[in-house]
Amino acid sequence: MTYNEFAMDVLELIEECPKDWRSGQSIFNIVDSKYGIARDVQFIDGIDCFYDDNQIDAFLNSAYKRLKNE
């Protein structure tokens, strides 16, 4: 899977999340439920898009790197 495929896979699922969630919250929860690596990105890599939407790109990049290294 390429980075673009991964990102599109995550971004397409945002519409299924509750409407009152911010984008970062949605992305975090999608990555956590589908791939199980969101908390590693948040706590080990120190990139937290759940509380800071400005970190979405960095979060997705770090999550993708973790998937590629599995």
What are these regions (language model features)?
Residues 1-70:
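C-terminal alpha-helical interaction appendages
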